[in-house]
């Protein structure tokens, strides 16, 4: 039986991913905080990915599969430049270095499978109608640049034989439950979630903006499928684009109208924001 470690397991996707495993599986979650109402039968480790001692202790248990979900989200990575690079890149490098240390200590016997959640933010415009896995990565944000760096680092550690795994580029997850986060794409969920709860929602872009979405359930499915893949049987650059639903903001709004009516749509307020 392979043990599973979910780094960033306190978040929405991490919690859903953990719940997808049978109770007989050994699952550990590491994060800064966890939902109070969670009844998951898992080991919870409080700590930051930037804390080398906590990471060393956690990895000393030699988990067979590691999902690396932890990150500073796009909006915060842009406004807090140093924090974005420290958490999204430097901490990931430290994590990989510790994986290599465990590999060397075991004389090559320990080679975990690492599934890293990257993002469509690695791409920059202009876009083709269909974006392939090997489309040029030319990010226009710090967050996107940080994700590209992590993809390349992971790919090199895999090439050197220190671990197995791959990076998967998730579309924007929509609709996210709960409160808005600091992601630049948070409004895509907000313009649906808030009106359905009788609350106003800000729309910072024009309604002809087209974006790429996937549901939380789909995201968990992508992660579990990635866990089952044999990297040796694949010929690719180490990162795969995940499928999603492409739609405009206007199409989102019309879908809301068809479900909740005009009164819900009236709660969406256009407030252009070039950021």
Residue ranges and their predicted role:
Residues 49-87:
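NAD(P)H-binding glycine-rich loop region in Rossmannoid oxidoreductase-like domains
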Residues 4-23:
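N-terminal Rossmann NAD(P)H-binding glycine-rich loop of SDR-like oxidoreductase domains
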Residues 93-140:
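Conserved Rossmann-fold NAD(P)-dependent oxidoreductase catalytic core, especially the SDR/UDP-sugar
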Residues 50, 79, 83-94, 137, ...:
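Glycine-rich NAD(P)-binding loop of the Rossmann-fold in SDR/ketoreductase-type enzymes
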Residues 204-206, 212-275:
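C-terminal substrate-binding subdomain of Rossmann-fold SDR/epimerase-dehydratase oxidoreductases
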Residues 40-51:
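Rossmann-fold cofactor-recognition segment
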Residues 155-210, 216, 220-221:
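NAD(P)-dependent short-chain dehydrogenase/reductase
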Residues 125, 140-166:
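Active-site Tyr-X1-5-Lys
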